[in-house]
Regions:
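Short glycine/proline-centered loop/turn elements that form peptide/ligand docking sites
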Residues: 132
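N-terminal organellar transit peptides
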Residues: 1-105, 109-128, 139-295
Length: 295
């Protein structure tokens, strides 16, 4: 053994004796990204929704951690904006392929609709037996105030250039041609959704398209049987089984400070009162999305 090698061995023994990990193999790191709530800027004013601008930076931080072996994605969402879902999905896939890092998703209460699309960004998907999974479809909802205006004696005046500019105006009677046009748009979005699911899940889905792509949703147990997910499991145990007991979990993403939460809440109070309707309707819409899943 050369003098240099002997000195290195001696130096290593000294560092080991004093617990200095300079020569030890670094512990594997799992970055943890959490997506919770409605997708898009439509959620509860106090608890903001999931949108690309707010998550691109944390996603990039996750893939740049040292000693990274995997990015774990926790999902608890009933869905929301297909565009925001797609933007986040694409960024995760782009970095996963660039960095050659596996992504594993874990569904909590729900990974439905856009929430399931986010899960499809992962190479593997796990869920609880009772998680709600699926809802691979498109829904549009709104309100009609025609009779309300009549009762209040209010006349609405709308001036447009272009016959479809005021399509589906909630203060006007619904038109058959407007609904037909909306359905065309929904079919386009649905086709995109189906293409993504098929490209990511492939032959793992063992049931027919007629069963999967109806907008229906299932429990985690049934979704596992269908091939919509890869197994029943939760983050900590699954990651330890894959990467060892000494795996280090590093949550990525900014948590709102107490002051920021108070400032968000002020939208419903004080200087936000004149816009109360714009604030209340998103809360109702968020509740409706969760209620569709029985949650």
């Amino acid at each position: 053994m050369s003098k240099l090698a002997s000195r290195l061995v001696m130096l290593r023994r000294i560092f080991d004796k004093f617990g200095i990990p300079i020569f030890r193999k670094p512990k594997p790191v799992v970055a943890v990204l959490r997506f919770s709530g409605v997708i898009g800027q439509v959620g509860n004013p106090i608890r903001q929704g999931i949108y690309a601008d707010g998550f691109i930076k944390p996603i990039e931080q996750a893939f740049n951690l040292k000693n990274l072996v995997c990015v774990a994605v926790q999902i608890n969402s009933p869905g929301g904006s297909p565009v925001q879902s797609s933007l986040i999905f694409k960024r995760i896939r782009s970095l996963a392929e660039e960095k050659d890092v596996p992504v594993i998703a874990f569904a909590e209460d729900a990974a439905a609709s856009g929430g399931y699309l986010l899960a499809c960004a992962a190479d593997e998907i796990f869920a609880d037996e009772s998680s709600i999974i699926g809802s691979i479809g498109v829904v549009s909802s709104g309100f009609g105030f025609v009779e309300l205006l009549e009762k209040l004696g209010i006349e609405r005046r709308v001036y447009t250039a272009g016959k479809s500019k005021a399509m589906l105006d909630p203060f006007k009677e619904e038109k058959v041609e407007d609904v037909a046009r909306l359905k065309e748009l929904q079919e386009d979005v649905h086709d995109t959704f189906k293409t993504i699911v098929k490209s990511r899940r492939g032959d793992r889905i063992v049931v027919s398209d007629e069963e999967v792509y109806t907008g229906a949703f299932w429990t985690g147990r049934r979704a596992n049987e269908m091939g919509l997910i890869d197994g029943i499991g939760e983050l900590t145990k699954t990651m330890q089984e894959k990467y060892g007991e000494k795996v280090v979990f590093k949550p990525v993403g900014e948590k709102k400070s107490w002051l920021k939460q108070r400032l968000s809440a002020s939208r419903l109070m004080g200087f936000g009162q004149k816009h109360w309707l714009n604030q209340v309707i998103p809360v109702i819409e968020e509740k409706i999305l969760w209620n569709r899943l029985g949650l």
